[in-house]
Amino acid sequence: CRYEQSAGGSRQSAFPKDDVFRPLLADPKQPQFFASWQATRARTDRTYANVGSVGFGENFGFYTRRDGCNGWQVGLLAGVFSQFNLDAPSSELINTDYIVGIPLSWRSGAWSTRVRLYHQSSHLGDEFLLGRPGFNRVNLSFEEVEAILSYDYRWARLYAGGGYLVDREPATLDRIRAQWGFELRGPTMDSPILGTMLAGLRITPVLGTDFKSFEELNWVINTNVVGGIEWSMDGSTRRLRVLLNYYHGFNPYGQFFAQKIEAVGFGLYLAL
C-alpha cells in the first residue's frame, strides 16, 4: 500500500511489512537508511565544508487493521542521523541526532495521515569538541507531537502539517513548527541496464520537495529538494534510490539549528 493500491479484503495482523502512510521522500529527518555527500556552505561566515551524512532507521509496524489499503496502523519509529567532516584528517564526527517514538497512521482512499509522538536528543562528536576548546555546547533535546495530512492524485502527492514541542531543552525554545511539501512519481518501467539480467526489476523517476518553518527561527522557510531514480522489484515494498539533493535554510541537525546553510550533493537511500 505504500506505492500501489490493493483490492484485498478486510484483515488485521501483527508486524505488517508496509505502512498505510507512505514515508516522506524529501524530509531530511525521515527515519531511513542512507549515505550521502554534500558540499555545504555556511551562509553566516561564508565557510565551506564537505559533509558526509549517514542515517539508520525505519518505522516498524506493530499492528494494523485494514480493508484493502484503507485502515490504520500503530508501530515504533527509530532513527539515527550522523554528520561527518570529510575535510578533517580523521573525518571527524560532528553531530548525531537520535530519534525514537510511536507513530499512528491512517488511510482512506487518496487521503492518509500520520500522527506521532517522538523524542529527539542531539550529541556532538568527541573529536569535534576536542579540536574546539571552549565550544559553546547546547544540550538540545525535546519531545514533539506531529501530525501530517497527505493527499495522492495520480502521479502527485501533496502533504501538510506541523508539530508542537510538549517538552524541550533549552526551555526557551519556541514550540510550533509547520511543514508541507509535494512529491512526483513518474511512470514505472523495466530497468534498461539491469532489467535483462534481473527479471522484474523496475525503475521510477522521483522528485520531492519538503518545506519546514519554525517559530523559533522567525518562520523562515527551509527547503529541501531531492530528485533521481528509484529501483524496485515486482511485489516488493523495498526501494533503492539514487538522489540528487539541494538544501537551503537553517541546519536541520543537532544544536546547529540556528546556522544558515546551503548544500548540494547526492546520496544512496534504502527503503525497507
Label the model's feature ranges.
Residues 21-29, 62-74, 152-156, 186-205, ...:
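Short loop/turn motifs that connect adjacent beta-strands in outer-membrane beta-barrel proteins
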Residues 45-52, 88-90, 166-175, 212-223, ...:
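Solvent-exposed loop/turn segments connecting transmembrane beta-strands
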Residues 35-39, 76-80, 115-119, 160-164, ...:
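Transmembrane beta-barrel strands of outer-membrane/channel proteins
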Residues 174-185, 197-212, 223-225:
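Alpha-helical membrane segments in multi-pass integral membrane proteins
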Residues 2-105:
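Transmembrane beta-barrel domains of Gram-negative outer membranes and organellar outer membranes
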Residues 70-184, 248, 257-260:
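Outer-membrane pore/translocation modules
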Residues 225, 259-272:
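Outer-membrane beta-barrel "beta-signal"
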Residues 57-59, 103, 146-150, 181-185, ...:
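Outer-membrane beta-barrel architecture
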